Amino acid sequence: MPRKFDVLEHELVPKHVLLSKEEANRLLKAMGLKKSELPWIYSTDPVARALKAKPGDVIMIIRQSPTAGESVAFRLVMRG
């Protein structure tokens, strides 16, 4: 039986976290943003699929950075 590939475990894929509605609302309020102002990630993206993200959800992406130590970005899941 073939092994299933888990995109979230790949060494080149940064950590992705699906935020709850409450977490997303707190984040947007703290940053003074509307959901529509966030960059997009499509619901068909392999990581969004792995997280079972739905359009309207917000994903936090945590990347390791040689200069900043850690870089955090947010994406709005869009139908795609």
UniProtKB/Swiss-Prot annotation:
Predominant cellular place of this UniProt entry's protein: cytoplasm
Transmembrane segments: none
InterPro entries: Arch_Rpo5/euc_Rpb5, RNA_pol_subH/Rpb5_C, RNA_pol_subH/Rpb5_CS, RPB5-like_sf
Subcellular location: Cytoplasm
Catalysed transformations (reactions): RNA(n) + a ribonucleoside 5'-triphosphate = RNA(n+1) + diphosphate
GO function terms (MF aspect): DNA binding; DNA-directed RNA polymerase activity
E.C. code: 2.7.7.6
Keywords: Cytoplasm, DNA-directed RNA polymerase, Nucleotidyltransferase, Transcription, Transferase
GO CC annotations on file: cytoplasm; DNA-directed RNA polymerase complex
Family membership noted in the UniProt record: Belongs to the archaeal Rpo5/eukaryotic RPB5 RNA polymerase subunit family.
Function: DNA-dependent RNA polymerase (RNAP) catalyzes the transcription of DNA into RNA using the four ribonucleoside triphosphates as substrates.
Entries under PANTHER family matching the protein: DNA-DIRECTED RNA POLYMERASES I, II, AND III SUBUNIT RPABC1 (PTHR10535:SF0)
Subunit text: Part of the RNA polymerase complex.
Full protein name: DNA-directed RNA polymerase subunit Rpo5
Protein source organism: Thermofilum pendens (strain DSM 2475 / Hrk 5)
